[in-house]
A protein has these predicted regions:
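Short catalytic/ligand-binding loop motif for oxyanion handling, primarily in non-cytosolic enzymes
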Residues: 72, 80, 187-188
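Short, solvent-exposed loop/turn elements at domain surfaces
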Residues: 48-50, 71-73, 211-213
Length: 347
């Protein structure tokens, strides 16, 4: 009953943020936080028809990274990799390969693989043959599990409430919001239902999708017909990080964003593309993982990112200093932080 009640509290908090019931814009932020002040001033200027900085509604495009920007990425690592571990080690309906099992067991001990093509191959292959609805249900079920490093938090609820507040604030001011994630698109869609964004505004990495009757035939040689069912093909096509984020923005949005939010150097190209050579006033924000009390932060990484913000002209967002809460006050971090060993995943 206690867990059920806590989940209700989280849902109510999110509902308050998304319905604008808070008394002031960005009320979960410290009022004088530099990032909040900069964003509110910017939005006021670009939405004022009498301002020299006015941006027409159709050009008000904001892009957000997911992991570490909108959503937890440090307990102990990315949602998509934890989903892979679950698939390989705990799903009775899946027969994992020896390679998948060895890698998943090693990662349970904190030895995470690098974010390279081999990692993406392993992840994609783990879901080969699943229908789109089966995979969607698999993700949603995993979202209902407890977040191990926190009390009173489910995996699917691990969103940064102050950042959800920004998404809603921008939408209320005529911005179109896109999520540009390195996580697979079909994983991100159910995970981000909380944002109430249409599927075409959720962009992520891509793997092949094929017909269940296609066999080994190339997509150019196969005609989809009545009775075919779409299944995951098990081959990664693109990892949506760094320059690939810029490419996907050009291909799928077709408009240069005016706001960009990220948290690591894998988002650097997206932020720099946003703020450089833009016909409109534009800003880029980078989150600093500097909170050790309410989140599994890393001060060394945070200090490095703060230096990068000065170098590239990004606005730093301090999770520790700028936010009144992260997941809601009912959520508490467990005492022992999960340690990331040498060679751990980092975007």
């Amino acid at each position: 009953m206690k867990i059920h009640c806590c989940r209700i509290v989280i849902c109510v908090l999110v509902a308050v943020v998304l319905t604008g019931c808070a008394s002031a814009p960005l009320s979960l932020w410290q009022e004088k936080a530099p990032a909040r002040v900069a964003l509110v001033e910017y939005v006021n200027a670009v939405t004022d028809r009498g301002s020299a900085d006015y941006i027409p509604v159709e050009r008000r495009i904001a892009v957000f990274d997911l992991d570490g920007t909108l959503f937890l990425e440090t307990d102990p690592t990315y949602f998509d990799w934890l989903l892979f571990e679950h698939r390989v080690l705990e799903d009775p309906n899946y027969r994992a390969t020896a390679e998948q099992t060895a890698v998943a067991k090693a990662s349970r001990q904190g030895k995470f693989p690098k974010l390279d093509k081999n990692r993406e191959r392993l992840v994609s292959e783990a879901y080969r043959g699943m229908t789109l609805s089966e995979f969607d249900a698999f993700v949603r079920k995993f979202m209902q599990e407890d977040q191990p490093g926190f009390t009173n938090l489910k995996r699917g609820d691990a969103f940064y409430l102050p950042m959800i507040e920004i998404v809603d604030y921008l939408r209320k001011n005529g911005f179109t919001v896109y999520v540009i994630s390195g996580t697979d698109r079909l994983t991100v869609r159910p995970l981000t239902k909380i944002l109430h964004l249409p599927p075409h505004q959720i962009i992520g990495s891509d793997s092949t999708i094929v017909s269940d009757r296609q066999g080994n035939r190339d997509a150019l040689d196969y005609i989809y017909t009545r009775g075919d069912q779409l299944v995951l093909g098990g081959k990664n096509l693109v990892k949506d990080l760094q320059m690939n984020k810029v490419s996907v923005i050009v291909r799928e949005i077709g408009v240069q964003p005016v706001l960009a939010f990220g948290n690591t150097m894998s988002d650097a190209s997206m932020l720099n593309y946003t703020i450089n050579g833009n016909p409109y006033r534009a800003l880029g924000f980078m989150l600093l993982c500097d909170d050790l009390e309410r989140e599994y932060g890393n001060l060394k990484k945070a200090d490095r990112m703060r230096r990068d913000c000065r170098k590239y002209g990004w606005i730093p967002v301090s999770m520790r200093d700028d936010w009144k809460t992260i997941y809601g006050d009912q959520v508490k971090i467990r005492k022992k932080a999960p340690a990331l060993k040498k060679g751990s995943q980092e975007k």
